[in-house]
Amino acid sequence: MLTEQQRRELDWEKTDGLMPAIVQHAVSGEVLTLGYMNPQALDKTIESGHVTFFSRTKQRLWTKGETSGHVLNVVSIAPDCDNDTLLVLANPVGPTCHKGTSSCFGDASHQWLFLYQLEQLLAERKTADPASSYTAKLYASGTKRIAQKVGEEGVETALAATVNDRFELTNEASDLMYHLLVLLQDQDLNLTTVIDDLRKRHQ
């Protein structure tokens, strides 16, 4: 969250009391929406943990999802270098847009978002009926079988590379990535965990 010093340095005069607040998905990086905060909206956002804007049409504080339940749970808030714009990282509960989409900016999402969405789907299949899908059946087969599939797909990916078959390499790499994500979910891990570890190694 913002430090006390950061809050004091916010330039409300420059923005006429309404500061743009960009809300970004804390995990996928997708830009979810843009709203405006006055000091009271920022205070409520920090106190409640839910993104709250000042509605210019209703002329009052408005917590995103206050009627639908599709709130935005705040992870962090940071000012930009000029102290006149806020970046809010949040985890959404349900779709952010009133049109039912994850972002108010439609399909203008980063390709990496698909991996996050795939992870969510795989997590749901973890407790599904084994007869309902290949993924659910794979979970039911147990960790050893899932790990075996990762090993098999890893070997097939390497073999495709050794013969310079780019088409087959792409297919096998996709299979490997899928089974690796299943294995991570099986062990209650995810890509974020792996990314955090890679980031630590890079430092």
UniProtKB/Swiss-Prot annotation:
Annotated stretches, region: Phosphoribosyl-ATP pyrophosphohydrolase: 115-203
Localization of this protein: Cytoplasm
Gene Ontology MF, one: phosphoribosyl-ATP diphosphatase activity
UniProt KW keywords: Amino-acid biosynthesis, ATP-binding, Cytoplasm, Histidine biosynthesis, Hydrolase, Multifunctional enzyme, Nucleotide-binding
Renumbered residue ranges of the record's region Phosphoribosyl-AMP cyclohydrolase: 1-114
EC number, UniProt record: 3.5.4.19, 3.6.1.31
Pathway: Amino-acid biosynthesis; L-histidine biosynthesis; L-histidine from 5-phospho-alpha-D-ribose 1-diphosphate: step 2/9; Amino-acid biosynthesis; L-histidine biosynthesis; L-histidine from 5-phospho-alpha-D-ribose 1-diphosphate: step 3/9
GO cellular component: cytoplasm
UniProt keyword Metal-binding present: no
A Pfam cross-reference name: PRA-PH
Main localization, broad class: cytoplasm
Recorded family membership: In the N-terminal section; belongs to the PRA-CH family. In the C-terminal section; belongs to the PRA-PH family.
Name of the protein: Histidine biosynthesis bifunctional protein HisIE
